[in-house]
Amino acid sequence: MNQNTLYVNNLNDKINKNDLRTALYMLFSTYGTVVDIVALKTPKMRGQAHVVFFDPSAAAIAMKALKNFIFFGKEMKIQYAHSKSKIIERIVAENDSRGPLKRLRDEADLE
């Protein structure tokens, strides 16, 4: 299970894909940094989206706050996604490739 990515379903499938992505971004970004939203209009993926957060704790807060939230006239269902998002895998790989010394310096700069 991936704790950065939320699987959202029972979305109104009559909404334009770009409008849906924008509305989901506006709603979920109030809980933390959203790095990606995947909302496809294929028959298999209609009414579903994946919202990817940078921080797993932000995803947990958003899931708790928005579970059963009425969104475009339908009650959203939210759970953790089963697989890791490609964007999170890329971020982790970039951090790992920098080496431990560079990571320590970056972390020290943040403090």
From Swiss-Prot:
Identify the residues that the record assigns to the RRM domain, covering every copy: 4-83
> Its Gene Ontology biological processes?
mRNA cis splicing, via spliceosome
UniProt xrefs under Pfam families: RRM_1
Q: Which SUPFAM superfamilies match?
A: RNA-binding domain, RBD (SSF54928)
Query: InterPro entries annotated for this entry?
Result: Nucleotide-bd_a/b_plait_sf (IPR012677), RBD_domain_sf (IPR035979), RRM_dom (IPR000504)
Q: Name one GO cellular component term.
A: nucleus
- GO MF terms, alphabetically ordered: U2 snRNA binding
Q: Where in the cell is it found?
A: Nucleus
Q: Tell whether Secreted is among the UniProt keywords.
A: no
Q: Does the keyword tRNA-binding apply?
A: no
Function per UniProt: Involved in pre-mRNA splicing. This protein is associated with snRNP U2. It binds stem loop IV of U2 snRNA.
Protein name from the UniProt record? Probable U2 small nuclear ribonucleoprotein B''
**What is the source species?**
Schizosaccharomyces pombe (strain 972 / ATCC 24843) (Fission yeast)
